[in-house]
Amino acid sequence: MNIFHEILSGATKYPERLAIVEHDQDYTYRQLLDAASQVAQKISAMPISQRPIIVFGKNGFLSLATLLGVSLTGRAYIPVDAHTPFERTQLIKQAANPSLVIHTVELEEKFSQLFTSRISYTEYQENIAFDFSQIDSRQAVSGEDINYIIYTSGTTGLPKGVAVTHNNLLSFTKWMNKDFSIIENNHFLSQALYSFDLSIFSLYPSLTTGGTLISLSQEETTNFKKLFERLNSSTINTWVSTPSFIEICLLDPSFVEENHPDLQQFIFCGEELTHKTASKLLDKFPHAKVWNTYGPTEATGAITSIQVDKTILQDYKRLPIGTAKPGVEIQIIDDEIIIIGDSVAQGYFENSEKTAEVFFDYEGKKAYHTRDSGYFDENSVLNYNGRIDFQIKFNGFRIELQDIEAHLYEIAEIEKALVVPQENAAHKVTGLIAVIHSSLSFETKAEERAFNKKIKPQLSNTIMDYMMPTKFIYLDDFPLTPNGKIDRKALTKQVLGGKN
């Protein structure tokens, strides 16, 4: 099986079916694949190498058609969102050394100067009559070819390009379609940026089964009024997002099953799904399936899943992350989750040093060090226990920051929580700051102190004395990354005033 053969075959069977719906425009499979074929034809006619191609733009029809067009030429695509800061874009271009940049938006002058070898989407629209049935799909990415490269943050500040092969993506897509019962003509929420690997949860399961992508623009996802209006006017069957994004949507009183009877399942990845969020969601959508999944970008989207229902909520205070997909083995070595098998990416693109640090061979199979702490419970279900990177030493004790956060979430009035270590000039931890967003509204510092006095005894019942936060800060909002996750780095900087 080849993903792009499947997409082309499906488009031949149902060319007039809607492939993607934007806020003001609908596009059929014929339109999408005709546009992708135009891209492929233009690239193939250019005297460029087989190196990866950067696609610079916003979510939607133009960028999706371009991604597919690049794949049809046998090249890897590198999605870079148009809202990406210039300095980061510059680092990605330097690291990737692409053969070409295709931009689907107008460029600012500094980006025009950066992208010296580039073409605009409008430059191949002269072939508008090109029929996708003429494309030779044998040239498409296949097997162990790199399908896409997602650039993630590196500890040194330099982005690392995770090189995901067609076989990686194929394994993921087949698992999604089977285990999540993706049927033909399903309508998927497509909210995640294409430069964020959560996007593949919607894109490829939808396109390989004749589904429709309900595409949200960044203008819609960052404006609550526009977001709620768009959701209420859309038919969605399968919801894909980070937990932080659904928490925003749950603020809308009209976001309930009665108003969204077609919403059959919610799939979450990208960050931890809290007990509280899952419980709220099931209260509002009692007949929908709620899936908690887990997996780093380096393991192609996700590699474990579990359906969260009332029984799971009753049995677990901190939600488990499930069981492994076919073709993947999970080992716990020194408390660390190790992923082995056909979902493990090729490595970091042209970065052998960083690749060697976390990718390795395990009994003849590809394996990856996640740096996530975890364990299997008595039901052989995998549980996430926080980032090993977030373990600190405080007064001689090793403390997992996310362990404290998990217990803060158990307190009814706490909606969001994050624990920040406070360090002195010698980088020694001198205190723990709990940053909290509460359902209560505190008008005065006295009210905050009264709440602290109330919750400390509750925390004392679940955490050791040395884990007790030394300071509590209350915020109305938590900053989010463009990918919809809580921005831990920005929040830490905000709390510590730029100093640690």
Go through the PLM ranges and name each one:
Residues S37, Q125-S153, L158-K174, P261-N379, ...:
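Adenylate-forming AMP-binding core of the ANL superfamily, especially NRPS adenylation
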Residues T28, Q41, P85, N97, ...:
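Core catalytic subdomain of AMP-forming adenylate-forming
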Residues Q38, G57-F61, R75-K93, V105-L107, ...:
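ATP-dependent adenylate-forming carboxylate-activation enzymes
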Residues K160-L189, D197-N237:
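Conserved AMP-binding/adenylation subdomain of ANL enzymes
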Residues L68-T73, I78, A95, L170, ...:
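Short hydrophobic alpha-helices that are characteristic scaffold elements of the AMP-binding
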Residues M1-I149, H275-A278, P326-E329, L480-Q494:
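AMP-binding/adenylate-forming domain of the ANL superfamily
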Residues G57-G60, D81, I182, A192-F196, ...:
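Conserved AMP-binding
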Residues I7-G10, L32, A36-V39, I53, ...:
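Adenylate-forming
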